[in-house]
Swiss-Prot record:
Propeptide feature: residues: 25-79, 173-176
Protein name, entry field: Pituitary adenylate cyclase-activating polypeptide
Effect on the protein of changing residue 151 to E: Strongly reduced affinity for ADCYAP1R1
Record bears the keyword Zinc: no
GO biological process: activation of adenylate cyclase activity; adenylate cyclase-activating G protein-coupled receptor signaling pathway; adenylate cyclase-modulating G protein-coupled receptor signaling pathway; cell-cell signaling; female pregnancy; insulin secretion; negative regulation of cell cycle; neuron projection development
Pfam families per record: Hormone_2 (PF00123)
The species this protein was found in: Homo sapiens (Human)
Signal peptide: 1-24
Gene3D superfamilies: 6.10.250.590
Amino acid sequence: MTMCSGARLALLVYGIIMHSSVYSSPAAAGLRFPGIRPEEEAYGEDGNPLPDFDGSEPPGAGSPASAPRAAAAWYRPAGRRDVAHGILNEAYRKVLDQLSAGKHLQSLVARGVGGSLGGGAGDDAEPLSKRHSDGIFTDSYSRYRKQMAVKKYLAAVLGKRYKQRVKNKGRRIAYL
């Protein structure tokens, strides 16, 4: 995997956490809250419903009647979950699109497709990849050099000397 910035990594971790929390119930995740149920009623140890003393207290005030509301605040209704899931999916898709577009651009540049990114012929920057015609010349020249090295090696191995003579006109002729 390529190197990611901190923001992308944080978004990925946030997405994984939100995905797992949205699609799993506390019981499925292995979390058990004894005595707290997400319904509007609170139940005692014996299973009988407890009376609602005051419905105007904020959640977490310490009364048994506020415990179900506090628990219900952690478990959002399906409509809110869908909205949060949609927002997260949209942000996650944007990040993935940017990553895939960057990879696609890098592959195009590596292949030499798309011309110069600088926009002008006067750029002094080194090219990211060699031109096709240079590649053909380099390949044929390196093939020629390999053939000559093989001929020279075979001549030395077979006992013949590899000589070069200069004729009267100054040309060099190689003998095997």
